[in-house]
Amino acid sequence: MASLPPHAGPATPLSPTRLSRLQEKEELRELNDRLAHYIDRVRALELENDRLLLRISEKEEVTTREVSGIKTLYESELADARRVLDETARERARLQIEIGKVQAELEEARKSAKKREGELTVAQGRVKDLESLFHRSEAELATALSDKQGLETEVAELRAQLAKAEDGHAVAKKQLEKETLMRVDLENRCQSLQEELAFSKSVFEEEVRETRRRHERRLVEVDSSRQQEYDFKMAQALEDLRSQHDEQVRLYRVELEQTYQAKLDNAKLLSDQNDKAAHAAREELKEARMRVESLSYQLLGLQKQASAAENHIHELEEALAGERDKFRKMLDAKEQEMTEVRDAMQQQLAEYQELLDIKLALDMEISAYRKLLEGEEERLKLSPSPSSRITISRATSSSSSSSGVGMSVGQGRGKRRRLETEDTSGSPSRASRVSSGSRLAQQTVATGVVNIDEVDPEGRFVRLKNSSDKDQSLGNWRIKRQVLEGEDIAYKFTPKYVLRAGQTVTVWAAGAGATHSPPSTLVWKSQTNWGPGESFRTALVSADGEEVAVKAAKHSSVQGRENGEEEEEEEAEFGEEDLFHQQGDPRTTSRGCRLM
């Protein structure tokens, strides 16, 4: 623009219109300067842009070549990894079949050992019975021997008593003979005394008559009354004398007869008692001999039975020792084979883990390259490549503690949730959209031999499994379940319920329509449903109140934003691939694998 000429004359006052035009000219000058500066800046930026476009084209060529090489390498590595995975799966199936066979053989060996142990227990019980019978027989024999000795002592005493009784009997016979002789003698003496008495009586009567005659001669002169009195007194005195004499003879005879009869009765009674004692002693001696013979036969039979039982026990012990040695050798061989199988599986798992790590590194590198290319295409406003959509899937495995053979296999597939963004490169305006999805995370923990094998999302049943080789008592145990933030519900087992080794039990809700069939199928009649939902917590609580197994699931939502640009599509999937990990490996606690 042309500048104003200098004013030669004196300064004149400027009008407001003049002043406004001068200000507008000054503003236009400044704007022209700014426009020229902006044009220079635009030209410099265009030159820089051309230079950057040239560099970008060069980078694209280099990147295309590198991506093609990496893609070829990745595809070959992926094919090798898939081949190794297929071989690993086949090898794992073969090893599982072999492990099943080994476990079946081990179970048969255990059953055989249990059977042998049962036979040994029965034989030991029989031996104990025979030993107790033998000891009882020995005790009875000792008792019989002591009884025999006592009986022999009694027999000796009875024989002594019998000898004494026989001696007494002989003495009694002799005494009886003496008494008989004495009786005869006494009878003779009595007869003699009677004869003497009769003679004395006759003599006495003769004397009385003589005395009476003398008195008659003397008392011729006595008064007749006095004579009668004298006769009466004389007759009375004679009568008294006669009665006294008869009484003495009678008393002597009675006493003699009583003494003789008493001695005779005593002798007969003593003889009868001696005969009875001797007969009883003979009978007892006969019975004792019979009992001794019977006990001797029983003792001989028991000794034969004990000898046969000892021989059988010895044979059973030898057979059991042989079976134990055979079973121990088989068990050692099986354990060695299982150790080799575990080592082989561990080696394959290590190789598989290395392949997964390599695959994860390749996935991350390819993802980084693609993000870099998409950023350059977006900045340079180039058309996106046909493969602008990226899909990332994660496979996670939850480790659960179990007491099996030593391997823990993740089971069950979670539900798949996706986050997708559509390609909006053809739209003239830049739009902002939000896409939402959900994620389901599950966790299973078991500290004992019984774990929670399966929980129905619809709340129809809960299944428990005994993964050990021993029976587990679940008396008064409870299954507690809580859905979201609701109240706890608990199912309580009966006091005598036992879960067999390797078996499962399913507790159905009453609304599921299942049939109550213990011990594998139980129906909770007071509860129509366990509570449906994908976010829950189920716990197995022992009778002491300790949680021995827990299975929890949490359902969460995720969001992704798209601002007129093409972003990633993320696919979260639990159990996308079956990942087999050695139990106790710390790497299996929480590990993810990204797959193209």
From Swiss-Prot:
Q: At what positions is Omega-N-methylarginine found?
A: R413
**Motif Nuclear localization signal per UniProt: ranges:** 415-420
| PTM annotation (Phosphoserine): residues | S15, S294, S385, S398, S400, S402, S473
Kindly list the positions at which Cysteine methyl ester occurs in this protein.
C593
Q: What is this protein called?
A: Lamin-B2
Q: Cross-referenced PROSITE patterns, in alphabetical order?
A: IF_ROD_1, IF_ROD_2, LTD
- One term under GO cellular component: nuclear envelope
Q: Where is the composition biased (Polar residues)?
A: 585-596
> Pro-region residues?
594-596
Per UniProt, the keywords (alphabetical) are: Acetylation, Coiled coil, Glycoprotein, Intermediate filament, Isopeptide bond, Lipoprotein, Methylation, Nucleus, Phosphoprotein, Prenylation, Ubl conjugation
Any one GO MF term held by the record is: structural constituent of cytoskeleton
- Placement of covalent cross-link Glycyl lysine isopeptide (Lys-Gly) (interchain with G-Cter in SUMO2): K59, K173, K233, K465
Which residue ranges have biased composition labelled Low complexity? 382-403, 425-439
**Region annotation Tail: where it falls in the sequence:** 379-596
Query: Could you tell me which residues belong to the region Head?
Result: 1-26
Which family does the similarity line name?
Belongs to the intermediate filament family.
Q: Where is this region: Linker 2?
A: 208-234
Q: Does Lipoprotein show up as a keyword for this record? A: yes
Annotated region described as Coil 1A, given as residue ranges:
27-61
Extent of Acidic residues compositional bias: 564-577
| Residues bearing a lipid moiety (S-farnesyl cysteine) | C593
Instruction: State its location(s).
Output: Nucleus lamina
Originating organism:
Mus musculus (Mouse)
